[in-house]
Amino acid sequence: GVWSQYLEVGIGPDAEIFTKSQAMSAVGSGFDVGLHPGSSWNNPEPEIVLVINSKGHVVGAAMGNDVNLRDFEGRSALLLGKAKDNNASCAIGPFIRLFDDHYTIDNVRTTDLSMAVHGPEGFVMQGSSSLSQISRDPLPLMTHDPSTLAWQLTLLNPFMQKRPLMDVGSKQWDFEQLEIF
C-alpha cells in the first residue's frame, strides 16, 4: 500500500533525465569527494560515465562515483538537485577510454559493475549489476541535450534500508576502503 516515485522510474514514456556535474562537482581520481555538511546519510553510486563531444556524439566512457545524499532525497524528490549537485560530488576516472574498433558503445551496454565497501569493525557491503539490465538504451538519451559533456548511467545503487551507510559528522566517509571493479 505504500507508493514511491522510484517504483515507476524507467518504465514510463518519459526518460528521467536531470542535470549532474555542474562545473565544481566533478573531480578526478584520487581527489577528495565532497559531501554536503548537512547530510548524515550518503553513499557512493558507481556508474558508467559517457563522454560526449560538442557535436553530441558519444566518444568514450569512464568510471564514475555519483555521491548521493540519501537523507535529502528521501525527504522529497524535489530535493534531488540538492542531493546530487554538490562541490566535488562526482568523481570521474581514473581515465576516459575513447571508443575505437575494439571498444564501442556495445561494450558499455554489457558492462558489469561491482562495488565493495569495507568499513570499520569488519563492516562489508557488496553489490553488483549489469548495464544490460538498464531500462533504456543510452544513445537515444544523449539527444536530450547535446551540449552535455558527460552522462552517468546508474543501475547499482547500494544502500542499507533505514540505516546510514556513512556518517559524515567529520565530513569524511566512515569507511576504510571503497572498491569499484
Segments the model singles out, each with a brief description of its role:
Residues 1-119, 127:
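Active-site microenvironments in enzyme catalytic cores
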Residues 107-149:
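Active-site neighborhoods and metal-handling regions in enzymes and metal-associated proteins
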Residues 138-181:
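A conserved acidic, glycine/proline-rich C-terminal tail/linker
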